Amino acid sequence: MKHLKGLLLPALLALASSAAAKDPLVETTPFKNELVNLMYFDDSGVALVQELDNGKIFRSHDAGKGWKEIKNVKGLGIMKSPYDNKVALILGEKKHWITFDQGENWDSFETELPPSPQSPVGWHAQDNKKILLNEIENCFTAPCLGRTYYTTDGFKTDPKVLVDNRRMCQWAKASERFLQGMDKHDDRILCITRGKYSDRSKDFRLLMSDNFFKETEEPVMSSGRTVQGMANMAAVKGYIVAAAKAEHSSELALYVTQDTDSWHHALFGDHKIEEDAYTILESTNYSIQVDVMTSKYVTMGNLYTSNSNGTYFTKNVEHTNRNEAGYVDFEKIANIQGVVLVNTVDNYKEVEKSGQSKKLKSRISFDDGRSFEKLTVKGKDGELHLHSVTNLHNSGRVFSSPAPGIVMGVGNTGEFLGKYTDGDLYVSDDAGLTWELALEEAHKYEFGDQGSVLVAVFDEGDTDEIRYSFKHGRKDSWQKIKLDYKIRARELTTLPDSTSLKFIVYASRKKDGGGREHVIVHLDFSDILKKCGDSDFDDEWSVRKDADGDPSCVMGHKQLFRRRKWDAECSIGELFKDPVPKFKPCDCDKFRDYECDFNFTPAGEGKEKKCEPGESFSLPKGACDGDAKSYKGSSGWRKIPGNQCKGETERDKQVERECKDAERPRPKTDKITSEITKFKGSNFMEQYYLERNTQSDGKDNERDKDETVVMLTDERTAYITHDHGKKWKKAVDDEIVRIYPHQYETNNVYFLTASKKVYYSKDRGLHDSINSFEAPVMPNTDMLPIMQFHPKQKDWIIWLGGKNCEKVGNKDCHTVAYVSQKNGEDSSWESLVPFVKKCAFVWREAGRSVKEEQVFCEQHTNEEKNAPLELISSDDWFKKKDVKFKSVVEFATMSEFIIVATKAEDNTLRLDASLDAHTFAEAKFPPKFFDIHQTAYTVLDSSTHAVFLHVTVNPQRDQEYGSIIKSNSNGTSYVMSLAAVNRNSEGYVDFEKMQGLEGVAVANVVVNVDEVNKGSKKKKQSRITHNDGADWEPLQAPEKDSDDKPYDCDVANREKCGLHIHGYTERADPREMYSSPTAVGLMLAVGNVGPELSTFGEANTFMTTDAGITWKEIKKGTYAWEFGDQGSVIVIVRRGEDTDHVYYSTDSGAKWDLYQFADHKMRVEAITTVPSDTSLNFLLWGKDSKELFAVNLDFSGLPEFQKECKLDEHDPTKGDYDLWSPQHPLQQDEPECLFGHVAQYHRKKRDVKCRNGQRIDQMHDIARNCSCTRRDYECAYNYERDSSGDCVLVPGLSLPDPSKVCSNKNVKEYYANTRFRKIPLSTCQGGTEYDKTGDVHPCPGFEEDFQKNHGVGGFTLFLAIVLPFAAAGGVGYWVWRNWDGKFGRIRLGEPGGGSAFDSDAPWVRWPIAAVSGLVAVIAALPLVVGSVWRWVAGRMGGGGGAGGYAGLGGSGYGRAYTSRSSFARGRGEYSVVDPDEGELLGDEESDEDV
């Protein structure tokens, strides 16, 4: 139990009580160890407590007077049901206990793994036998996912597994007010689980089930679509709130439901909600209250309150005080509606600017937060300030208890809140309206007997006194209990409802002989006071706030309590009976009792607030029919549901509204529009899309409608547009030399000057959000990447600058790497290492278990400028460094593996790979590669659980070609996939994966290798694979061209008359791709039909809609293309000659229409749209005589796109979509079986007129797995395919001894050699399993284990085989981008938004679900939760990354594109990732580098 050490005692969460008189009874019980989890069962005298060091649990049945150990039970923590006062759980490592009679009897049950450290138990609010139990999450491969069990009989029978791969689960009825009194959804459970086919956090889904996940439903949000990227959820009063996080953004979308059937998108006006930056607070029965952090580095927030259905949030308080853990100084006074205490930061400007320490002031509201005022002390001028939730000194609520109107706190008078130890104890008996000094010095305090007794104990050191008052704590009413010893109080508590006259003080005292012992002091005031009579009560006490002394109206009524008079020295003595208020209705008030009606949006605040029709506003039935000019409709206001005010106001009445304002304004035109903007300059240097969070449906959310592009011209002027190029403005008024968008946070962008000044925005340049910081030194001048970003910690930046480089030619000029953990702000730069070529953060979401601080750098040996490079590593910002490799040419980090190219003594390259950034293993290449002088590698792709690597065979200029080899699923053993693949001198390879589909790729091969080796020109043909490189074949040419004429060769003979298309090596713009991730199965290309690929000038434009099986020629000549609205519209524009028009198709290329965008011809260089291809806007970039231009094309006005497409996942073909399954052209039997399964994708029906809108999840389902056939296998290591397609041993090789793997002591068995290995993507089952043809044998010494364990599970195999070989697994979607001209084409993987943190398990310390009114801290639970159990070492975690078209080698600077893709061609799930993946690892020109 050592792992429980260091947990603070704070335990009970909403406790309270009191004490007083002649001689209260005092009983002391000593304990041997420190205590935690002191808690009462509600409405009883039964308490539990736990010893920290050994987990022993003790029970008291008489309110802490006597204690007995519960035999044979030792736990990690205690969880008490918040809804049943007889039920509690003791959680052990694997054995747990439950009681249904307040701990008199305990029944045990077991789980396979220990409980989750974060949220181990889910209680059902209405059935005490229904419980969820969450096991500890597996964070080994990240993001952390775990198993949840359920019971419906209170663990009388063994718990059953609910779901295996969940982020979190809860009952729908997880809070008392949710569906209260409704007889539905009793068994409904909501879980956030792994994606349908992915473990990445961006794919997490919210699923519901009414039959324990035998069947599930994914709820649709207010957009009518399901939402991926679900991060968290919490039950708050009558609401459930779920948070979704978009990829490449820390911004969250909040969704709220009151019944789990319909969900609303919560809108916060202009404010964005970010992960780890908001706290859902204790809310009212009719609204949700959320505190939103205003700055990443300053713990301050703004408090927002929702309307009654949780949709619109308005700001109530600015600059609330928060702490790092997400706790907020906010408390609703218990039992009294409308009274709220907060602490705000007075010097917020100085705190934000210079990090000055905070000056706090306390404020109180009596109208539910609509207005706030100072705290005043009776008879004194000046303000009172109190310590609140961020500085807890006791369990339970901070200020209040169910005792009506009696409030206490520790604080001081003066200008600001001082130190706790300088504070005194203050009390108010009018709910905070006025205060008086109760006791000098800081004290812990409690309320008892509905406020008749107040107890306090000194809290600044040891004391031998306990103080109590029977007169509401008035100054001279405090009496003393003298103890025989001095104690240091740790906790003071009583019954949660504060009705008891018995209290418990948990404390420590000095022991004889040194040291301290722990004691529980029981205080009993029962026999001191007489029982109160009727005359001792005030029957209608209330918070008298109005100027005339009338009770305040909250929610349309006054609240009245029967309360003991302050000077009546008697006890109420109604044990376990909570004070219940009476209500009197008030007259309705138009400001206080109303909110905006449905489909109306609030604008303005306070008395200026208006309710205006929202975008989804629609006319009442029959209104505006015929010639009607007006209609009667809602005033825009409605009475807040649940409000009990009487009478009517003008806001209840319908108003006359004009018909012309009623409907949502249609687009100004039903045609395509274009807008041309001219710019000075000769070239566009860089352009980037900053794509908004596509997760939020944005229907009513103005801040989510922008389509932002930033652009730099060669005049060093940066421009920005928020409407996709209709209007442009200068981004900053300064000379800009580079633009860096943040790879992992699409809201962030950086504008670099030639000096140290850097401009940046964290909100896509919206809302005047462009600020600046000073870099430590000017940018480097060596054409090296200047900025590197962290996949998870979005404010961590590595800056590669130049020192002593101000003067050109200075010999002392060299590179230095710096790091900032504060986005470069507040002079936060630390020096890392000098003389470096590149540095990169190593942490990734997918399973690389390293510290977030881990950095790899390439540094010149001995810090000498021209010395060879070393690969060095550090996880403490290079206070210590570890040299991993010498003579390094290049390294690349992908999502799951790191590869390093080093130069051997014979000048050949060697490739090493690592899974964990610590242990590296040399890659095993096909045997005949050992004869090749390996001069360059290009990493092509690893999106299909295997790495594709191009190894250069002929490096001679203009004659380059090489072989594509493909790895096994852990990236270390390679086999031949395709020989003689074309490459150019910059390391680009003619190879491209089809986006959005598994296993389809196109490559160009050199067919006259022998002649080329003798100096001849290359002849090229195109090849396509439909099974991830196992089989390649020529492309099938169409029978006729676009003029309906046959080609002049026999297209049936594909070898001599195939379709050949131009690839990367010849593209004028390497940013273009054949396909789009959101237009599944569609590809466009330029090429020709014939025996070989001809010149670009002779090419025409072709298209396929079935993933490359059949093609058709769509236009003569070469065109550039873009996909819009996920393939709903395709736009093509003439390339390489002047034009004034584009063609577009809205039916997947069946028909093409012309649109003229200019009155004269201009030269168009490129066409672009948002990376996810979800927009109906496009940009043409080009030159018109001496000016640059950008043309916006807007297709959103077309009638075809006026309604949104309907998609029902349960009946997908019912609406506007079909299901489409890709096929393999060579498979006669079951051609739709690809990779062992039939995949089904959503595709919009060709003839429907609607827009896709919000991005849809293209993959619908894996319909079924297929039986294994030869197509599911490729040749194993040491084997190659012969002309008949069989796998034969490479000539001249003898087979290695398979038992040699037994030399590794972790390996217990081996397979005999087989000729085949399964394609890593394949999920086939049964049939003919070609890779199992070799028998499995035990290693010597493991025969017994072999017999016992045969068929060991995948996870064990993973540990036994992958880790011992330090394998590198290449998984991740890759897209590309181009960085710094030098690095050429980069395909990069996908950053994630995961997060991990080490923390003490909060439930071990705090057994109830709220800390001083804190109901749920969504932001303080990042998306991935780290483990605290002692047996799970280190930081497990999620985040992101992936690999790219990393040319591995070479120094040649390549194309003159100075951008990363110039258009962050991240395209949805394929996204911009590591700049380091863009480099050629080794090259014939690279000798000078080492």
UniProtKB/Swiss-Prot annotation:
InterPro entries (alphabetical): Sortilin_C, Sortilin_N, VPS10, VPS10-sortilin, WD40/YVTN_repeat-like_dom_sf
Region named Disordered: 1016-1048, 1465-1490
Protein keywords: Glycoprotein, Golgi apparatus, Membrane, Protein transport, Receptor, Repeat, Signal, Transmembrane, Transmembrane helix, Transport
A Pfam family this chain is assigned to: Sortilin_C
Membrane topology recorded in Swiss-Prot or TrEMBL: Multi-pass membrane protein
Domain of life: Eukaryota
Subcellular location: Golgi apparatus, trans-Golgi network membrane; Prevacuolar compartment membrane
Role description: Functions as a sorting receptor in the Golgi compartment required for the intracellular sorting and delivery of soluble vacuolar proteins, like carboxypeptidase Y (CPY) and proteinase A. Executes multiple rounds of sorting by cycling between the late Golgi and a prevacuolar endosome-like compartment.
Protein's recorded name: Vacuolar protein sorting/targeting protein 10
